[in-house]
Amino acid sequence: MGLCYSVDRTTGKEPGEASSTATTAETVEERSGSGRWRRPRDLKGGGDIEGIPQVLGRLVSNGSSKIACLYTQQGKKGTNQDAMLVFENFCSRDDTVFCGVFDGHGPFGHMVAKKVRDTLPFTLLTQLKMTSESDQSSLVGANGFQIKCTEEEEVQTTESEQVQKTESVTTMDEQWCELNPNVNNDELPEMYLPLKHAMLKSCQQIDKELKMHPTIDCFCSGTTSVTLIKQGEDLVVGNIGDSRAVLATRDEDNALLAVQLTIDLKPDLPGESARIQKCKGRVFALQDEPEVARVWLPNSDSPGLAMARAFGDFCLKDYGLISVPDINYRRLTERDQFIILASDGVWDVLSNKEAVDIVASAPSRSTAARALVDTAVRSWRIKYPTSKNDDCTVVCLFLQDSSVAMEVSTNVKKDSPKEESIESVTNSTSKEEDEIVPVKDEKIPESCGIESKMMTMTLAECISVAQDDEEWSALEGLTRVNSLLSIPRFLSGELRSTSWRKWL
């Protein structure tokens, strides 16, 4: 409620309205000593910020804006553990936007995902502000990442942050060099290095706060995180876990292409596996799912985590699991159309190209994310009819104005060869309504007709269809039942919480 209170202050409400806000604050104050209700705190990235959804330009539920749309749908495994975020005018800059998708797992995965979603942007703002104060020259320039904190984003540095501010960042720098040996700093804009350091520090701080959180048990619960910050034509993407970011761009022939911006950080990747084994963790796949490598404790067949990096999951943090993001930079061009951020519930059943084509062929920008989620859900029923589909979450960030996209779409239609137009006769009706026309040589009818097929196909036919489909590579998605197989049983109750929180 702290942020709600500051928003009311700046908007100049009537006295009657202000009194209602004060009453709400008093109510929270009275409940601060019980259960999950806690005293409102400042926006340092570590507290429960009740009023965050009221920040202008911040979207966390199904909806859309002029430049983005987002949609999530609960799977058949229980509570929806996915979270998403679109934060426009980030850092109070009109040309800057922050987007993220967070896929939780474990008993409290939904709480961890929402916690990271709510705290990461403001923690990043805090770290950027600290960097700007300590080294302003590194942030100001032609492409500088200048920070202008509004009253809602103003952060007061606490004693714990003062301690972290004096800590050396040598360890993170070494990790960065090991993870990105081929990065040439001369080719990067001035805003990149400060932002990279701020992202590394923010993830480290959030993981520490999760470990000490009084109401969220993160011992065997965690979340992935795929985030992006777009400032002008500069794009910075950070990835922890197996959620994914994909860019839709056009080649010289105006054909729509899918470019994967992140790597699915699976335990069987050579670098990830080497680090885990060096820390005495184990990496192997079970016999009934040989294609899914998992992380296991040294002396216990648990928890079986299907990713090499994650927030939380402190039972594995001493055995190779890390929360260091894989950060990449890309300079956007006029050929780039949109970016898709999605959880693995989408990528397990759809390839990058299929996802790009579905978004491009959506009736409108506001329905693009939902169209992709709906197609993913139907694909789960077709490909794996006996499995429970996972939560599916999509964030679409559009890089071009709708008028520009329509013009490009028209040019593609005029320049398309005759032989390619024959293959696209079945899609001619939908193309007239599209803002961005998909590639002509891609076969879309299968995804478009899934719902009608489901009405007539028997279970045996569905299984045969799934078996006839081509195999999926590691980049296109893996089929698995759960991100976390089992929970290790050591101590119970307060004894366990006291034990693992001493690992700081």
UniProtKB/Swiss-Prot annotation:
One term of GO molecular function: protein serine/threonine phosphatase activity
Reaction catalysis annotation: O-phospho-L-seryl-[protein] + H2O = L-seryl-[protein] + phosphate; O-phospho-L-threonyl-[protein] + H2O = L-threonyl-[protein] + phosphate
Annotated residues for binding of Mn(2+) 2: D103, D344, D390
Gene3D superfamilies membership: PPM-type phosphatase domain
Binding site for Mn(2+) 1: D103, G104
Cofactor: Mg(2+); Mn(2+)
InterPro entries: PP2C, PPM-type-like_dom_sf, PPM-type_phosphatase-like_dom
Signal peptide: none
Keywords, alphabetical: Hydrolase, Magnesium, Manganese, Metal-binding, Protein phosphatase
Amino acid composition bias (Low complexity), ranges on this chain: 17-26
Entry-linked PROSITE patterns: PPM_2
Biased composition (Basic and acidic residues): 412-421
Any single Pfam family the record assigns to this protein: PP2C
Region (Disordered): 1-49, 410-435
Broad class of enzyme this protein falls into: hydrolase
Residues in PPM-type phosphatase domain copies: 67-399
EC number: 3.1.3.16
Cofactor note: Binds 2 magnesium or manganese ions per subunit.
SUPFAM superfamilies: PP2C-like (SSF81606)
SMART domains: PP2Cc (SM00332)
Domain of life of the source: Eukaryota
Keyword field contains tRNA processing: no
Family per record: Belongs to the PP2C family.
Record-given protein name: Probable protein phosphatase 2C 18
Species, as recorded: Arabidopsis thaliana
Upper classification of the organism: Eukaryota, Viridiplantae, Streptophyta, Embryophyta, Tracheophyta
